[in-house]
Amino acid sequence: MKNIVIFGAPGAGKGTQSDKMIEKYGFGHISTGDVLRNEIKNGTALGKTAKGYIDNGQLIPDELMVDILAHVYDSFGSDHKGVIFDGFPRTTPQAEALKKMLQERGHKIAAMIELSVPEEELMARLINRGKESGRSDDNEETVKKRLNVYHTQTAPLIDWYKKEGVHHHVEGLGTVDDIFARIVNEIDQLSE
């Protein structure tokens, strides 16, 4: 089983590459945004609790987020080939909580794949995406803020995963297929 954290700044291509990994390897996919929306939409107990925090403009506590992810992770069954964690963890305490949740099931993170893209390219991709899709969070000012949050709050996780011995740096420039070939190279070298 190969549980993988896909990691990178906004605009690095995490969603695009996750889709390609799912297609090639048959992995499950846990995107925190999608998971939260589904739990709330389905009216689960966890979803109702999460909605209370969201409605009050509060961040969802790490413990609740891990409970929600555990619920989804367990729904894949014991014979899945692995799961891609997309959008989680974002902080060291979240990474530690995810590690503990997986250990309780006799599992682990096999790799943290960091898609590394230069700042100028991220800005260009995100602003272009905003123009094409009409996403209001992809204008220049908001993009700069999102990248700053990534660098100050999320990027320190790279060192944590390096210490865990599962960090894999992947150059995120080039065509989608070029980048995916680099990811496949990393995944195929992982032991079961």
What are these regions (language model features)?
Residues 1-192:
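Glycine-rich phosphate-binding loop of ATP-dependent small-molecule kinases
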